[in-house]
């Protein structure tokens, strides 16, 4: 994911605009996405991202987490296959939040619904344009492989 897009997502999470995401802000966004988590699960997510252990996630920590954390950027190091499996599971969970009808594809309307819940003022037409930019197979939707490429910054753009 390009840094400009990561910054835009970060700003959605950073509700008070102080340049860092608190556990409360993370929990609020997850509730808006229809994925309310208990305090323990929110804390676990924060711990995964908060490499300097100050209790908040700043933009650099957020970017490192979403672009494949390394041990130098707060990652756990360890077995690459374990990290890849954990990353794949997290991506699948994120994909399911967007895929409201569980058909394995994210439509412009599904993307629009989630972005509106996050406070974005975009239109369905804007969402269609976003989807076209990553829709490698031309079906008008984003499947999991396209979503994975988009989230990993690995191409898929036309």
UniProtKB/Swiss-Prot annotation:
Binding positions (Ca(2+) 2): 50, 52, 54, 61
Binding annotation for Ca(2+) 4: 135, 137, 139, 141, 146
UniProt function note: Potential calcium sensor.
Protein name according to UniProt: Probable calcium-binding protein CML18
Keywords, ordered alphabetically: Calcium, Metal-binding, Repeat
Signal peptide: none
Domain EF-hand residues, every copy: 1-36, 37-72, 86-121, 122-157
Residues the entry annotates as binding Ca(2+) 3: 99, 101, 103, 105, 110
Organism: Oryza sativa subsp. japonica
Binding-site list for Ca(2+) 1: 14, 16, 18, 20, 25
GO molecular function annotations of the record: calcium ion binding
């Amino acid at each position: 994911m390009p840094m400009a897009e990561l910054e835009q997502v970060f700003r959605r999470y950073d509700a008070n605009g102080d340049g860092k995401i608190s556990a409360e802000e993370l929990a609020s966004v997850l509730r808006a996405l229809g994925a309310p988590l208990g305090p323990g699960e929110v804390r676990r997510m924060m711990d995964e991202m908060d490499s300097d252990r100050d209790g908040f996630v700043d933009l650099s920590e957020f970017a490192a987490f979403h672009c494949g954390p390394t041990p130098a950027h707060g990652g756990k190091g360890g077995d690459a296959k374990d990290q890849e499996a954990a990353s794949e599971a997290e991506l699948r969970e994120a994909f399911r939040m967007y895929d409201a009808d569980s058909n394995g594809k994210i439509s412009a309307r599904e993307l629009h619904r989630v972005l509106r819940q996050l406070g974005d003022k975009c239109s369905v037409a804007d969402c269609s344009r976003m989807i076209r930019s990553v829709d490698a197979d031309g079906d008008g939707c984003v499947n999991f492989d396209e979503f994975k490429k988009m989230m990993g910054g690995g191409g898929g753009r036309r």
